[in-house]
Amino acid sequence: MSWLTPEIIDVLIAVLKAVVILVVVVVCGALMSFGERRLLGLFQNRYGPNRVGWGGSLQIVADMIKMFFKEDWVPRFADRMIFTLAPVIGFVSLLLAFAIVPITPTWMAADLNIGILFFMMMAGLAVYAVLFAGWSSNNKYSLLGAMRASAQTLSYEVFIGLSFMGVVAQADSFNMVDIVNAQEHMWNVIPQFFGFLTFAIAGVAVCHRHPFDQPEAEQELADGYHIEYSGMKFGLFFVGEYIGIVTVSALIVTMFFGGWHGPFLPPFVWFALKTAFFMVMFILIRASLPRPRYDQVMAFGWKICLPLTLLNLLATAAVILYNAQ
């Protein structure tokens, strides 16, 4: 075992941490799908899934078994290679986007000095999965849904980047750990409230969640860009959407609500509680808000979110300049 040097041991520990964290994220995404159906049932005065296992607790397992054994059908005129590659790209990019989130001071999949830029890169890569899925399916509804999704995602990613810039300017770092440590005495949500508001709205839009789910509007597009997908390919898109929700919720906590900081309880517990709160908010938004028209969604972004983020960035720069004098 002479090859097992301290450096190799450190690398193995880092890889093991990353694998554990990413597996937990996938499990959290699957659990959220069950929690969403139960909470929507509660909000809408119905039962929700309650047949498989005690209180429906094994519904996730039943769904996984069903997806695994469903026919993996590919449309006759589809581009088979791109059609197969699209859900993999979407799932992997959304999963890797979580890698830069620090759960505790020592637990994170990747501690990068350009953590925020890495997240923006992975979020941008997910757009290709949607475009590939819509184009390769050779279906007009699928292509229209993909065009909607790509335009919406690219638009709202601009607002995400601008809302991050105020936090980066205050913390003087792109590193997520440095940003969390800068909130030890005051959370960023207080000086950066408009940045938080814009990021929360844009995060819902980028995840294609209600009320910004026009790319998948069942009444208009018959389920949008993944209309032709079935089996595990559809499962990757399905779980990937919930992984995106977990990632956005964790980023809200990290960037604006102090990350793992909190009194009395261990850092991991604080991070988990804060993230779970915002995941429930995603579900509550779906249960309570109507779906606007697509042109209203785009107009809201460019006419309201963009000026709001620019004003927030201008005010942040003015405060930093004043304090430096």
Curated annotation (Swiss-Prot):
The chain crosses the membrane at residues 11-31, 81-101, 114-134, 149-169, 186-206, 237-257, 265-285, 304-324. Its EC number is 7.1.1.-. It is found in: Cell inner membrane. Keywords: Cell inner membrane, Cell membrane, Membrane, NAD, Quinone, Translocase, Transmembrane, Transmembrane helix, Ubiquinone. GO terms for molecular function: NADH dehydrogenase activity; oxidoreductase activity, acting on NAD(P)H, quinone or similar compound as acceptor; quinone binding. The keyword Glycosyltransferase does not apply. It catalyses: a quinone + NADH + 5 H(+)(in) = a quinol + NAD(+) + 4 H(+)(out). Signal peptide: none annotated. It is an enzyme of class 7 (translocase). One of its GO terms (cellular component) is plasma membrane. InterPro entries: NADH_UbQ_OxRdtase_su1/FPO (IPR001694), NADH_UbQ_OxRdtase_su1_CS (IPR018086). PROSITE patterns: COMPLEX1_ND1_1 (PS00667), COMPLEX1_ND1_2 (PS00668). GO terms for biological process: aerobic respiration. NDH-1 shuttles electrons from NADH, via FMN and iron-sulfur (Fe-S) centers, to quinones in the respiratory chain. The immediate electron acceptor for the enzyme in this species is believed to be ubiquinone. Couples the redox reaction to proton translocation (for every two electrons transferred, four hydrogen ions are translocated across the cytoplasmic membrane), and thus conserves the redox energy in a proton gradient. This subunit may bind ubiquinone. NDH-1 is composed of 13 different subunits. Subunits NuoA, H, J, K, L, M, N constitute the membrane sector of the complex. PANTHER family: NADH DEHYDROGENASE SUBUNIT 1 (PTHR11432), NADH-UBIQUINONE OXIDOREDUCTASE CHAIN 1 (PTHR11432:SF3). This is NADH-quinone oxidoreductase subunit H. The gene is nuoH.
